[in-house]
Amino acid sequence: QPDRGLAVVWTMREEQLLPAGVMPPSVRGARFCKAERRKECLCGAMVIPGREPFGYAITGDTVVFQDSGGTVRPCLKQIAKEQSWREPGLGIFLYDVWELLTSDDLKQLSELERRITKLENTVLSGVSGAFHQNLMAVRRKVMVYVRYYAQMADMIYKFLENGNGYFSQEDLRLFQLFRERIGRLGEEAQNLREHCLQVWELFQAELDLRQNRIMKVLTIVTTVFMPLTLLVGWYGMNFHNMPELSWEHGYLAMILVSGLTVFLTIWLLKKKKLW
């Protein structure tokens, strides 16, 4: 009640709201933040990550919350306890509610960033474990915040349009400040999304590098022992006109030839820096 210098909050039952015709839309099954301009009010819903959704309806001097999950109630109690407005009004009230609802968002985003950095260090240390599942879980949470801030920005834009004429220029200035705050949080969420993508690409690069190392080892082993396979296949034919088969030192000679072949092959690979 700006004319009397008062800001009053009532807790009312649903049936008490019906006669006034100021009833928020049902939030049952609500999946995103929205604002709708109707003839008699500005109404919509807010779906905040990790909290129960709630609905709201605004007329010229009244704000009604449908808050069965208890999301807004702590904010109203804190405002009643701590805030002392020089000029109580609709805009400053909504601004303070939104500020309190998003006060922990930066902390939540910082925690997600910490988890992403931890996964990145896990990749660099070569310990993958359940990396894929953990990264996908973090990415899903990041995407929830990305969509949430985009929806909030659209919702605040509806308030800035002021189609019902409920808000003063000072109210619109506060709404614009909050929209800029939401924009910064949205940019932070987008940065986390890109960080997730970079960590995934790093994981794929490390995976490809490991596979290349394995293929390199297999190629070297095949190259080293291919001549020995040729010797084994050659002398395994046991032709009678092979003098080495009946030679007294034939077995020892084959061992020496095989060892010399392996040594020369390894030396050649190292000289060519292939190993």
What kind of feature is each model-predicted range?
Residues 1-161, 167-168, 177, 181-184, ...:
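Peripheral, non-transmembrane regulatory/ligand-interaction domains of membrane transport proteins
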